[in-house]
Amino acid sequence: MRILVSNDDGYFAPGIAALAEALQEVGDVTVVAPERDRSAASNSLTLDRPLSLRRAANGFHFVNGTPTDCVHLAVTGMLDHLPDMVVSGVNHGANMGDDTIYSGTVAAATEGFLLGVPAIAVSLVSKAATDFSAAARVARDLAERFTRIPFQHPVLLNVNVPDRPYEELRGLRVTRLGKRHKAEPVIRSVTPRNETVYWVGAAGQAADAGEGTDFQAVAEGFVSVTPLQIDLTHNGLIPSVAEWIGR
């Protein structure tokens, strides 16, 4: 199995190193990741300048672009064959609920999915963690499952792993996305040159962490596996909007 690995934390991040090592047990791994941290880059593509592709000493490839750039470039311009799977991560921090809208980790997997490849985004639910081995093993397990029981159509899975040893994980739970409260306000600051600058505030706390959510699963020690889709249409509002337009 040919596996394309990417992330949004950069090619030097410990999470992607652990992920690539674990996935080598189930397939031929190629790593193409951003040259620097591109967290919260979402699904952005770089259109205002050319991209460069370079190879690091450890064999990883890195691109001066976004996570989406990395997967798009690899699949459409670098690799000789379409990968059998795209795996993005392991992200240093959760990607649950509304996080998925902004996440570069999820975006890299989404780009693979859009290009017709089954894809998984894997995140470790901790900003303080230094051991990514459990999350990497979960990714390996899921990739191995794909080889044994392939889906008939490409699938996009968002996976969040509690920060605990692999042996202490309570299993996998298929979930829906929860929802966060709105983000904290931006933080105003003044530089030594007396310039006013702003830092984006922290993500909001969970507003919907109820039954069936990714938040609940992780809090209870389960790995959250959420199937995602691309269609943003609010089908339930189509009749109401049509009536409103027709007035």
UniProtKB/Swiss-Prot annotation:
Listed Gene3D superfamilies: Survival protein SurE-like phosphatase/nucleotidase
Record's cofactor remark: Binds 1 divalent metal cation per subunit.
Main location: cytoplasm
GO cellular component: cytoplasm
Cysteines joined through disulfide linkages: none
Enzymatic reactions: a ribonucleoside 5'-phosphate + H2O = a ribonucleoside + phosphate
GO terms for MF: 3'-nucleotidase activity; 5'-nucleotidase activity; exopolyphosphatase activity; metal ion binding; nucleotide binding
Record InterPro entries: SurE, SurE-like_Pase/nucleotidase, SurE-like_sf
Keyword Cytoplasm: yes
Transmembrane segments annotated in the record for this chain: none
Enzyme class: hydrolase
Binding residues annotated for a divalent metal cation, in chain numbering: D8, D9, S39, N91
Alphabetically ordered keywords of this record: Cytoplasm, Hydrolase, Metal-binding, Nucleotide-binding
Cofactor: a divalent metal cation
EC number from the UniProt entry: 3.1.3.5
PANTHER family from the UniProt entry: 5'-NUCLEOTIDASE SURE, 5'_3'-NUCLEOTIDASE SURE
Record function comment: Nucleotidase that shows phosphatase activity on nucleoside 5'-monophosphates.
Name of the protein in question: 5'-nucleotidase SurE
Annotated source species: Aromatoleum aromaticum (strain DSM 19018 / LMG 30748 / EbN1) (Azoarcus sp. (strain EbN1))
The organism's taxonomic lineage, starting at the top: Bacteria, Pseudomonadati, Pseudomonadota, Betaproteobacteria, Rhodocyclales
